[in-house]
Amino acid sequence: MDKYAVFGNPIKHSKSPFIHTLFARQTMQDLEYSAIEAPINGFVESVTAFFSQQGKGCNVTVPFKEEAFQFADQLTERAKLAGAVNTLKKLDDGIILGDNTDGEGLVQDLLQYQVPLEDKHILLIGAGGAARGVILPLLKQNPASITLVNRTYEKAKQLAELFSPYGRIEAKKMSDINKGFDVIINSTSASLSGELPQIDPVIFSGGAISYDMMYGSGKTIFNQWALKNDAYQAYDGLGMLVGQAAESFTVWRGLRPGSKQILRELRKT
């Protein structure tokens, strides 16, 4: 039986084994998927041991995505630009391929909700690893523009410059934002810390779609704020989690599983 896993620390909370077990059942693939808590300073040793013991592929979550980027022998274009890897696959020749499926997970979730991205004005809040991983897939949807804002403007500016060859993207200071957008994506952990970005809620005016990469049992704090300020609709990041998992599964098995049923199951728990 082919072995797969997710590496992280902590990892007990991970929904990945549940998701991939359902994907395997749905696509009739014979595999096992486990959660492995690697020591903070022992990711390389743990993942090397996993691949030497017939491991076929793995997901990587915090805090090891940058280490996985360094560990991979070969990188996809989206992983190179993301600067982080969340999916490793052992190829037939023993080469370890590093990929990043986070952005594809976000885009697929937005499209599943029938959120149009082409020719739309997108505001991306945050300039950390989560933002960096989704910019290229968003640009590939041909939006009219992506505006990047961050608490530290310089970080947003550097990220906008990195991705400028791939599409229309610019960085702005939060204090300079004074208009509405079509789609607002929050890549910060604001909802977990109970804080809100220091930005004018006018961004939601005119029926914007709000998307928070965080998720919880109810509406996230960011999405509550969005709806209170005239956002048309608000979605959390649980579908992105399922979407990136589906993309990883496709990378490993060459089959794309359906996400809707799994998302329904997760909403029940």
UniProtKB/Swiss-Prot annotation:
Enzyme class, first EC level, given as a word: oxidoreductase
InterPro entries: Aminoacid_DH-like_N_sf, NAD(P)-bd_dom_sf, SDH_C, Shikimate_DH, Shikimate_DH-bd_N, Shikimate_DH_fam, Shikm_DH/Glu-tRNA_Rdtase
EC number, UniProt record: 1.1.1.25
Gene Ontology molecular function: any one: shikimate 3-dehydrogenase (NADP+) activity
GO CC terms: cytosol
HAMAP family: Shikimate_DH_AroE
Assembly, per entry: Homodimer.
Protein family according to the UniProt entry: Belongs to the shikimate dehydrogenase family.
Listed name of the protein: Shikimate dehydrogenase (NADP(+))
Source organism of the structure: Aliivibrio fischeri (strain ATCC 700601 / ES114)
Gene it is expressed from: aroE
